Amino acid sequence: MSAKGCLALCLTFVSMFFGIAEGRADSALTFENGKIQFAGIEMPYRVAHVGGTGNPSLVVYLHGGSSKGNDNEKPLNEAATDSISRYLESRHIESIVLVPQCPADKSWGGPMLEVLKSLIDKYAEECTDFYILGGSMGGTGTWSMLSVYPGLFTAAMPVAGNPSKCDADHVAQTPVFTVMGTADRIMNVEETSDFVDQLHAHQGIAEFEVEEGWTHEMTCIQSYTTRRLDWVFSHRRNPSSIEKATMGGSERRVVGYYSFDGKALSEPPIKGAYIVRYAGNCGEYSTLKKMK
């Protein structure tokens, strides 16, 4: 075989391998194109509907830095998009999956958090539970969303991200499963470990796993296992009985109502979604309630 033929064969095997790791060629889900504008920022996104049972969930995946742009295509090629979509299908979880794309000149922080919130608001009325997951820049963005919008999400899974600038008290209001790799040269494992300790100190529910030898890229690709996703999606809300929500087996009382932007409400609205703050002998906790 000629050198050119050998090279072509090698490239074929390489593309086959990475097609499995990063592609979505055989995914059953159809992602439709969408676009949203907020505060002068235009953000493309993809949306797919997963059929299943029960009340629908809203699932948001935040991509890493290499998928920024406006083609509305690169985020779908990330391995996590496929892993999460397949999981939802296999578990028959009725859900709306959102995969937004960050503009090339921005990151998942600052004003982009408000843009993401406006996208979530667009679909909030249809869903009972909200989940957010992300890797690398998307992992950091996931941490940031938990910090800026405490109690909005039912559970979250940031991987290979940086939570060091986040408010641990706010983040602790959402159950979190995070993963890091010992060979990650971009994110700091110790910083994440310290932050998880802070979450525990605030009575937060947080799982932290460190994979030996995993690089930054490996962590972003391989973290979304069935076992971990089972943990994330095992957290559910029950809007019909939210006033009797318990934590640690104790009854809790309502101490306040808030809009999604943190403004205190004198009473719950007669329509729409809002946040309820509870208090009890296990501390305070925020969760979402919907009125139709």
Predicted regions located by residue number:
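Primarily recognizes the serine-hydrolase "nucleophile elbow" in alpha/beta-hydrolase
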Residues: 127-172
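A domain-start/cap signature at the N-terminus of enzymes
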Residues: 6, 19-58, 95, 135, ...
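C-terminal tail/sorting-segment detector
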Residues: 240, 245, 273-292
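Residue-level detector of functionally pivotal "anchor" positions at catalytic/ligand-binding pockets or at interdomain
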Residues: 237-263
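Active-site machinery of serine-nucleophile hydrolases
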Residues: 58, 62-114
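C-terminal catalytic histidine-bearing segment of alpha/beta-hydrolase fold enzymes
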Residues: 177-179, 185-239
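Acidic beta-to-alpha connecting loop that harbors the catalytic carboxylate
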Residues: 65, 102-103, 137, 182-185, ...
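Gly/Ser-rich "nucleophile elbow"/oxyanion-hole loop immediately N-terminal to the catalytic nucleophile
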Residues: 51, 104-137, 147-150
